[in-house]
């Protein structure tokens, strides 16, 4: 029993002792791991205590060299890395440990011991190191180099990252290079002087002289080649001449090739000419001299032509109006008109007429008829002042050709005055037909000789005369007289009575043509005879109805006034007391009226087309 208890106590004590040992070992390992994590240099020092694979390789290399030295003493082969005594560390720690384990497995313990002993003996046999002044130049000592030596030797600068992990082995001592700073001092002291610069210039000149003959040789070769090609061309030409003599003047190349070459040459020439012309035109445009004289000449010619046309047209129209009016001119105007009638047209005016007809594309006969009829081509406006015939064409004032509102609307009259809506102006009548003839057809010829009770003073009379349009092709004596048909309304209707007289005469002429039943066959050549009152009433009613249709429902005052006019002046009752046996217009006069109305409709159509053309432009 006692032995068993003692055995148990001993086992317990051993267990307790083992537990303490295990806990202490774990604590020590824990502390060591913490220290290694905090201080990695300590880990590197502990790792470097083991023999590195580089050291092993170096020792093996030394041993091989010694063996070769014993074998070949006559021709020793020195290697710059024979004096390596410091191990090279080029890889990381993981690779080092891996290589160490592999080298351990490869070498046995006896080999290890032999290598280590030989290395120790070699270290003991080496002489003591020389002082620092006589120390050989080592590449791994970066402090020995000045900062500018790599630039002086033009060596490759190693990056800082590689220099930290790489160490170069020591070299053998060289007798020629005892002082490592000797060469660098020479380079630093050496500077460029004027003499050195002069020598450099002379060297460059010599180099240029050396390169010169080669260029001359090349030029000579090129010239020889050109001469050779020229000789070949000459031979080819002589062969062609000989062949032409034999064949009969034909070239070697066929006709198709000749044609192709000719066409190609022509195309090239044309392209070159066009390009040259374009360049010249561009240069002229840039300089601002292209086309300016031509355009100015064209504009001047057009302006001169328009001025001449306006002068000739106004001159001839005045001449025709003066001849057709038949009025007696007294004073200087009468003498001038007589001279114009006696004097024929000169060659210059005829030439101008031909030029106008050619530019306007109007036959000369039509142009003369238009001038006689009083029409105005190109919308020329006649002035309102009294006619004064000029002796020469240069005395005629210029026409207003630059008016943009010439074809502004179809309501513009020939005299340049706007037509009121619903009012027709008396325009160019056919030859031999005047307003007086129309009034004679209506039986109102006695109104011409009456005097106007309006216009109390001369100013108002002149003002009213300025408002009246001038009808070309007839004199002012043949125009509609400014008289009052209704004396009891002169105070209210004086401002526009003159226009109403003209409108009424024109409208009655139109109604006469539109309703031919108003004029019986026996009334075309009327003799004063009593007319029944029933016929008068019927004619008055028809005229009133036609006037109402023309004026419309809005103008009641004008309808009342025209009703009074129709009552006061019946169609068949007005007679001329002085000439009771006067004959009136016949069928020819009626045909002239119809021709005038057709002409007016055609002119309205032309104005409408001109307006449409101007709007489209």
UniProtKB/Swiss-Prot annotation:
Leader sequence segment: 1-30
Compartments, record wording: Secreted
A GO BP entry: eosinophil chemotaxis
Chain residue ranges for the region called Disordered: 261-307
Pfam families: Granin (PF01271)
Family: Belongs to the chromogranin/secretogranin protein family.
Function description: Neuroendocrine protein of the granin family that regulates the biogenesis of secretory granules.
Something else known: Binds calcium with a low-affinity.
Protein's recorded name: Secretogranin-2
Organism: Mus musculus
